[in-house]
Amino acid sequence: MRKNWTDEEIRVLQNNYEYVDTEIIANFLNRSYHSIKNKATRLGISKNSEWTEDEDIYLKYFVYENDDDISKAAEFLGRTKDAVINRLVKLRKRDSSVSFIRRPWTEKEDEILKKNYIIMSNAQFAERLRRTKASVAGRKVLLGLTNKHMSKEDDKIIRHLGNQGYTIKEISAEMNLSYCLVKNYIRNHRINYRRESKNGMNGWRKEADATYSLYINAKKIKEGQA
């Protein structure tokens, strides 16, 4: 029995028919291939013509130039933004040298990284966010996201060094951790630290260094006795 089309089904068809394979839409809506084709005809929507070699060359150049406004490419080619985005995805799968458009990172994307970086790989993020793996990896570094978890002992040492007047750079060097990781950990946990100064090391810092040396030596002795 022929079932009536719902508003939601029509919306899905209108938003995807131009650039998504008809069989995929048919499976998604649980309708026949011919039902999808006929409804699209009645709605006056059609598939974009096949992509030409010249259009693909333009897109590759567009990405190479790092143009971040995809609307310009869509307007120039007479296609929708979604059609252009999906074509870029296909081109990249064929040729890894074709990177995704370098666009500014949004707060929403950053939140996705923060909430899922433990369980998702860079490749999975790249596919989901339509970015390169290198771009994802770089952003994670800037956000201080790493699979390394700070232990209670790490946290204790960082707080101790911060209270003793160490800068973020000095703490990261002392603990052999990346600067970005330490910086973001300190700021996210509101840990005290000394801001960078051009005046060199003051007397109070020398005293702090001596105190820290005693602390580390005592810690090593305790570990040796365990």
Curated annotation (Swiss-Prot):
What SMART domains does its record include? SANT
- This protein's superkingdom? Bacteria
Family that this chain belongs to: To L.innocua lin2408 and lin2600.
| Protein's UniProt name | Uncharacterized protein Lin1255/Lin1742
Q: Which organism is it from?
A: Listeria innocua serovar 6a (strain ATCC BAA-680 / CLIP 11262)
